[in-house]
Structure formats: C-alpha cells, structure tokens
Amino acid sequence: MSRRRRFKGRDVHGILLLDKPTGLTSNDVLQKVKRIYNAAKAGHTGALDPLATGMLPICLGEATKFSQYLLEADKRYEVTAKLGERTNTSDSDGEVVSTRPVNVALGTLIESLDQFRGPIMQVPSMYSALKHNGRPLYEYAREGIEIEREARPITVFELKLISFEGDEVKLEVHCSKGTYIRSLVDDLGEVLGCGAHVTQLRRTQVATYPYERMLTLEQLECIFEQAKAESIPPREQLDPLLLPMDTAVAALPEVNMLAAVAAYVNQGQAVQVAGAPQSGQVRMTVGPEREFIGVGEIDDEGRVAPKRLVRYHDEHDEE
C-alpha cells in the first residue's frame, strides 16, 4: 500500500503583523495565515485572549527561530474595564462571581493607579496558558481546581488613564513581558473595593513594530482571492507584506562580517570580528548588503559564536 505524500507547504520567511480579530484564538488565526501563505512553518509570538484584538506578529519559515525575542519584548495595550463586577476569568467572557456598588471618585482612581506603575509583583490568572505539571492552568480552572500560583515580577512602564465615565474605565498600558492585563484590571478592582473585569482589550504594539503595518485576516483573504482571480501567483502579492525576519532582533547590536568569515560561522565556529561588543547577543550580518544570517553570542574569548542561524532550503517552493 502506497503512503500518501505529505504536503509540506512552501519555503517562505518573514514576519506578518496581523491585526487579530476578537472571538478567535491566536492559534486559530495562526492556522489561517499559514494556509493563506501556504507556509511550511509558522508560529505566533505570544498569545492574545480570544476576546482581545490587535497586534499579533506571525513568524513564517526561518523567522520562527527568532520568535522568542518578540515574546520577551515590551507590549502596549488599550483596555476598557467595567467596575462593579468581578468574573472568574477577569474578562467579560467569564461568569460574574461578585457584584458590588461603584463608589469611586476620580481622585481615588488616579491614586490607585500609582500602585501598579513601575516594578511590581503579579499573580497570574488561573485562566492563563502557564503550565503546572505539564498542563495549562486554564484546564485546571475549567475543572474547578485552584492551583497556588507564585507572584512574578513584571514592570509597568506606563499606565495612563484615558477616560472614566460611570462604571467604565479606559487605560493605556506599556508593560514588560509576562504581564497579564486581565490580572492587572482584576487587582485594580480589588484595590478600588468594587471589583472589575476587562470588556475590551487591544494590543497596539509589540517591541517597536508600527501600528500602521498591521493587516487583518479579511485584507489577506481579499488579496489572496484577487490574485487568484487575476491569475497571479498569490505569493507575488502576499510576500511583499512580510517584514524581514531580522526585525525581530532589531534591538540587538549589529556585527557585520565578511563573507569569508561568515562561512566559518555557518559551520558553527566562533570567529573574531573587529568592533564586536564585549558581551551579550548580537545580530549578525554579512557584507555591504548586510544580509542577516542569524544571532550570535560573545563567548569568553571575545569571539562571536553562532547561537541561531538562518538556514534556507535549496528545493523549489511548492505552490
């Protein structure tokens, strides 16, 4: 019996800034983008809740090797919270577990926000993807099991009050990796004494990626269908929308080297490069074209040692 040939998709590399719609999981939209691009490999860079919208960088091909740098990057959010109701998920997708009157003055709210600025400790929500004994916490939560969680250090660089009307508060948050906005709102509600939960959440920035470069699923699907209708290979319209994969590591200092030196790096060898930093990770480029070949790390001898290298396949792409 012959085995059916597995379809692998095509070799495409880059980062798409997707404007995630509400109501879908991050994996839902990842699979849709992967299918539209017919990509062999794809991964996202930090899940957004189904309720949330906004920037979700999707890494395709070799760009997936550098997704961790975006996971660790700062984020910006716009969040709307409803005071007076606390839910089991800390957002409007959950069940209301307590209702309290809202007697919050503007001055009290402004003063309370001070407690959540700067380096703080935060206890993650039970409805999160953090793992306990190999299982995400939300699975335990759905079974009614409460797992003790340790508070984790996070940093809230900015916390701006946008508006406060009735029982609705709108905030803008600039925070470090690992920050749960739902937990932030839930904690704020407890400090105010009335409870609170998230009703709208939008991620507006990851690292330094520009807001205006985001694309919706509808836009991608429209581009794909229009290309097919005009007998144009969809890749010709879709691939230019991708950002270069090295934008994921743009914060790292660049080390530019000659092609002859890069040949040793591509074989896994550490090399001496004039002008390299004394320590830390670096973004490695080659020649005057500054072709990105991966991320290196300065070893104990001051050499640039390869850490993650870009590898392109030689075979022809599959449509």
From Swiss-Prot:
The UniProt catalytic activity note for this protein reads: uridine(55) in tRNA = pseudouridine(55) in tRNA
The record's section on Gene3D superfamilies has:
Pseudouridine synthase (3.30.2350.10), PUA domain (2.30.130.10)
EC number in record: 5.4.99.25
Q: State the Gene Ontology BP annotations.
A: mRNA pseudouridine synthesis; tRNA pseudouridine synthesis
Q: Which CDD domains match?
A: PseudoU_synth_EcTruB (cd02573), PUA_TruB_bacterial (cd21152)
Q: Which HAMAP family match?
A: TruB_bact (MF_01080)
Record-given protein name: tRNA pseudouridine synthase B
Give the source lineage, highest ranks first.
Bacteria, Pseudomonadati, Pseudomonadota, Gammaproteobacteria, Aeromonadales
